[in-house]
Amino acid sequence: MTQMDEAKKGVITDEMKAVAEAENVTPEFVRRGVASGKIAIPSNLNREEVAAVGIGAGLRTKVNATIGTSTDIVDFDMEEEKARIAIENRADTLMELSVGGDLDEIRRRILDLSPIPVGSVPVYQAAIETIREKGASIYMDEDVMFRAIEKQAKDGIDFMAIHCSVNRETLRRLKRQGREGGLVSRGGAFVSAWMVENGLENPLYENFDYILEIAKEHDFVLSMANAMRAGAIADSTDRAQVQELIVLGELIDRAREAGVQTIVEGPGHIPLNEIKANVILQKKLCRGAPFYMLGPIVTDIGAGYDHIVSSIGAAASAAAGADFICYVTPAEHLALPYPDDVKEGVIATRIGAYVGDMVKGIHNGEKDLEMANARKKLNWEAQFDAAMCPAEARRIRDERPPEDPDTCTMCGEYCAVKIVNEWLDSADTRIFD
């Protein structure tokens, strides 16, 4: 029985109880959300211990960190370090997206070390192994695609991005639409090229019921991949993207009937003024399924600082109702991220998600009040504790110690807070009577 099957029967699972406790909501609230498809809990039956993470309506916006090798840089130890850094800095999930080296080994190593849910994109493995064997991904056998899904499910992958919404109609719309930035989804590119070269429908779309059988057997979450997402602001919310979203909504109906949990991937590159419309459109067409925004990137010119660009997009997306954000690092569009990039990406995205959650009422700024009180009292330890990244806050202060330990080197003896605190404590306050 899957989490969704149990929820539909009225059963509250241990995972639902754990999510409820972490989110400060009732177990029944979580059960209803899972039953309706508005909350997903990635937890493969083949993993003995994985944190119960709830994604969806009424819950804290979650942050995903992607890791993985490239063809140019294959360093499994570094990828493990990146995973550990993401976990230490409180990413909620990981995605292992390697395309270089032994793909089975690196995936299993990450699964072994990660206490949080791990996702993947199985068509990467199918395409890469075909390229190694036959020279090009267009020679993929359909069976190779499904074997990759089944293998990764047996390994314990908790959620998989499946490119099942690329079909002939979405490709026709993409062709007619034309784009400034082209198609930027790697999985979408593999599938689209295969379809065009072979003159056939996408097997992942055509055999979606088979994918549902595999997902139901192992109870992993289908992350409905957005292959038609824009890779440039100029292409945002175009006909190809909307056409794909319509297909995704129809596939989600079938997944829910089968008792399979889903989340829906979204943009991408999108200007701030279109984020709310995209969230409304996705929630309407996909009947409230959890929305997984990739970044989003709200301007194309932030190279080297795209984690900041994404943090802005994450805040706006979470505020508008998005449920899950994939981080972006400073290396985005430039290079494979290093461990330090991963840390920066996780923290920046967590800040954006936190800001958005304040808008949608997930929290009332309790941590902000804690920080405000600590600052007023010049209590530096309490300030560190309240910070999003205590270690970084402490590092900066320790590197530049002030002469007066109550203050910082920005204001020193002219610290406004200290001056006012001392004045109010010592001055004649009859003026306020």
Swiss-Prot record:
<feature type="binding site">
    <location>
        <begin position="185"/>
        <end position="187"/>
    </location>
    <ligand>
        <name>substrate</name>
    </ligand>
</feature>
<feature type="binding site">
    <location>
        <begin position="226"/>
        <end position="229"/>
    </location>
    <ligand>
        <name>substrate</name>
    </ligand>
</feature>
<dbReference type="InterPro" id="IPR038521">
    <property type="entry name" value="ThiC/Bza_core_dom"/>
</dbReference>
<feature type="binding site">
    <location>
        <position position="269"/>
    </location>
    <ligand>
        <name>Zn(2+)</name>
    </ligand>
</feature>
<dbReference type="GO" id="GO:0009229">
    <property type="term" value="P:thiamine diphosphate biosynthetic process"/>
</dbReference>
<comment type="pathway">
    <text>Cofactor biosynthesis; thiamine diphosphate biosynthesis.</text>
</comment>
<feature type="binding site">
    <location>
        <position position="163"/>
    </location>
    <ligand>
        <name>substrate</name>
    </ligand>
</feature>
<comment type="similarity">
    <text>Belongs to the ThiC family.</text>
</comment>
<dbReference type="InterPro" id="IPR037509">
    <property type="entry name" value="ThiC"/>
</dbReference>
<keyword id="KW-0862">Zinc</keyword>
<keyword id="KW-0784">Thiamine biosynthesis</keyword>
<keyword id="KW-0004">4Fe-4S</keyword>
<keyword id="KW-0411">Iron-sulfur</keyword>
<dbReference type="Pfam" id="PF01964">
    <property type="entry name" value="ThiC_Rad_SAM"/>
</dbReference>
<dbReference type="InterPro" id="IPR011060">
    <property type="entry name" value="RibuloseP-bd_barrel"/>
</dbReference>
<feature type="binding site">
    <location>
        <position position="333"/>
    </location>
    <ligand>
        <name>Zn(2+)</name>
    </ligand>
</feature>
<keyword id="KW-0408">Iron</keyword>
<dbReference type="GO" id="GO:0008270">
    <property type="term" value="F:zinc ion binding"/>
</dbReference>
<keyword id="KW-0456">Lyase</keyword>
<dbReference type="InterPro" id="IPR002817">
    <property type="entry name" value="ThiC/BzaA/B"/>
</dbReference>
<comment type="function">
    <text>Catalyzes the synthesis of the hydroxymethylpyrimidine phosphate (HMP-P) moiety of thiamine from aminoimidazole ribotide (AIR) in a radical S-adenosyl-L-methionine (SAM)-dependent reaction.</text>
</comment>
<dbReference type="GO" id="GO:0051539">
    <property type="term" value="F:4 iron, 4 sulfur cluster binding"/>
</dbReference>
<feature type="binding site">
    <location>
        <position position="95"/>
    </location>
    <ligand>
        <name>substrate</name>
    </ligand>
</feature>
<keyword id="KW-0479">Metal-binding</keyword>
<dbReference type="GO" id="GO:0016830">
    <property type="term" value="F:carbon-carbon lyase activity"/>
</dbReference>
<feature type="binding site">
    <location>
        <position position="292"/>
    </location>
    <ligand>
        <name>substrate</name>
    </ligand>
</feature>
<feature type="binding site">
    <location>
        <position position="415"/>
    </location>
    <ligand>
        <name>[4Fe-4S] cluster</name>
    </ligand>
</feature>
<feature type="binding site">
    <location>
        <position position="411"/>
    </location>
    <ligand>
        <name>[4Fe-4S] cluster</name>
    </ligand>
</feature>
<feature type="binding site">
    <location>
        <position position="265"/>
    </location>
    <ligand>
        <name>substrate</name>
    </ligand>
</feature>
<dbReference type="GO" id="GO:0009228">
    <property type="term" value="P:thiamine biosynthetic process"/>
</dbReference>
<keyword id="KW-0949">S-adenosyl-L-methionine</keyword>
<feature type="binding site">
    <location>
        <position position="408"/>
    </location>
    <ligand>
        <name>[4Fe-4S] cluster</name>
    </ligand>
</feature>
<feature type="binding site">
    <location>
        <position position="124"/>
    </location>
    <ligand>
        <name>substrate</name>
    </ligand>
</feature>
<protein>
    <recommendedName>
        <fullName>Phosphomethylpyrimidine synthase 1</fullName>
        <ecNumber>4.1.99.17</ecNumber>
    </recommendedName>
</protein>
